[in-house]
């Protein structure tokens, strides 16, 4: 990363985290030169970029100051929202992406009026191919499909015939709730396999692969939704070997690949010979859900069927979004934004983990939390069986704390764990401990109430 981008990201994160307050003056250029061990021109370039993004402003003969946000923004942040998994709107560079949209309309204005690119915008595909290589996903252009989000890719994969001739889909429990809804509404044969902080039972997985007539296994190896855990390299290798042995396809949903902090954490796709693993990538968490652009890397054995169904279902995925994304990636803006949001979310995830460990040590019997080696934007707490979660959620809502259970992430008849989901993508770092302590206080009160009720 260029030095000025490092300085820019660092200052921006400090502003977002409240280390540098709104309306306050930044350190002098001379101080920043010393702090970041660089030359004056590099610091000035970073400051000019921040000024262009309306994050800071300059006062002649005085220095640079942090822009004050509107009162409405501050009011909206009063709710401490652990329930939402949407990206933080405050860290999205609206002006940058607006510029890319305008540029896309100017550049591709003729293409916007033409039907017939079901594989995706032709000029975007090689850009995506190059980007995927950074995630250790090496593939040919003809295997890359641009879809209207990962949900569309899942719908197509569920519908098309597979070479193994099987029809049953295997999913982790819990998993992505909208895919569960899709399977149930369309009456697709489905089997669930339990996933916990310890992973999945590989012996059970092999038994299901061997006898269950499985079409494909839908899995979220990295930063699992909603558990927040990741498979180890050993687990991924064993899953890939089992898939090949029993001719079962793997659908790998790598929706948080851009937030990975471990450079050695390669996707499951990289461990396969590209014949049994289908790789899905989303931009909804790193940019915004409304972009409606996803990427599917499809093996040659099902590429024609995927193309045909995609064309029938949706002639084009959003062309303006695709064109804007191409410009956003090629300009280097995507990489800069990725580094900024990854740093911001990483700091929040570490704050969440440390707070939960501290609070658990203070209240050892109140809830169960197992810190993972990986630090994602969400995790789960196991609460006592006698706590009525609906009551807890209602009481927390009354004091402006939003949380949720993971009940909807289970199939209807699958045994559910009593887990409380905590997501920090929409919470400022300095609000995390306050929110956690309020949650714990409400759990204490409900436990005390239950204890008194039993005594009476």
Task: Please give the residue ranges for each predicted region.
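Conserved core of the PLP fold type I
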Residues: 112-246, 258-259, 263-271, 450-454
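Short, solvent-exposed loop/turn elements at beta->coil junctions and helix N-caps
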Residues: 283, 367-368, 407-411
């Amino acid at each position: 990363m260029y030095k000025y981008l490092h300085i820019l990201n660092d200052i921006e994160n400090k502003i977002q985290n409240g280390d540098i307050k709104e309306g306050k003056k930044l350190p002098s250029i001379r101080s920043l030169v010393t702090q970041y061990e660089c030359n004056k021109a590099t610091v000035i370039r970073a400051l000019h970029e921040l000024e262009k993004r309306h994050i800071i402003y300059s006062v002649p003969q005085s220095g640079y100051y942090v822009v004050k946000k509107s009162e409405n923004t501050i009011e909206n942040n009063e709710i401490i929202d652990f329930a939402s998994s949407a990206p933080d709107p405050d860290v999205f560079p609206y002006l940058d992406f607006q510029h890319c949209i305008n540029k896309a309309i100017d550049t591709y204005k003729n293409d916007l009026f033409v039907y017939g690119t079901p594989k995706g915008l032709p000029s975007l595909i090689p850009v995506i191919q190059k980007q995927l290589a950074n995630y250790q996903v090496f593939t040919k252009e003809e295997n890359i499909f641009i879809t209207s989000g990962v949900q569309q890719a899942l719908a197509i994969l569920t519908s098309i015939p597979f070479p193994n001739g099987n029809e049953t889909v295997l999913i982790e429990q819990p998993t992505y709730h909208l895919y569960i809804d899709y399977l149930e509404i369309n009456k697709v044969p489905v089997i669930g396999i339990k996933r916990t902080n310890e992973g999945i039972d590989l012996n059970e997985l092999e038994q299901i692969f061997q006898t269950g007539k499985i079409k494909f296994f839908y899995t979220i190896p990295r930063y699992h939704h909603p558990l927040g855990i990741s498979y180890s390299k050993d687990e991924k290798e064993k899953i890939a070997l089992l898939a090949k042995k029993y001719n079962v396809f793997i659908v790998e949903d790598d929706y948080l690949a851009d937030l990975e902090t471990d450079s050695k954490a390669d996707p499951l796709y990289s461990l396969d010979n590209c014949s049994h693993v289908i790789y899905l990538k989303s931009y909804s968490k790193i940019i915004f859900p409304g972009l409606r652009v996803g990427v599917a890397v499809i093996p040659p054995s099902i590429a024609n069927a995927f193309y045909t169904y995609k064309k029938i279902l949706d002639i084009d995925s959003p062309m303006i979004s695709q064109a804007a994304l191409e410009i956003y990636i090629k300009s280097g803006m995507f990489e800069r934004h990725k580094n900024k949001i990854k740093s911001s979310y990483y700091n929040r995830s570490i704050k969440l983990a440390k707070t939960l460990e501290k609070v658990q040590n203070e209240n050892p019997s109140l809830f169960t939390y197992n810190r993972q080696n990986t630090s994602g934007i969400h995790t789960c707490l196991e609460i006592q069986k006698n706590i009525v979660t609906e009551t807890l959620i209602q009481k927390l809502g009354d004091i402006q704390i939003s949380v949720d259970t993971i009940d909807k992430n289970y199939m209807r008849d699958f045994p559910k764990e009593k887990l409380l989901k905590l997501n920090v993508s929409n919470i400022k770092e300095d609000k995390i401990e306050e929110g956690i302590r309020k949650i714990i206080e409400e759990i204490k009160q409900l436990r005390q109430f239950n204890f008194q009720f039993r005594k009476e």
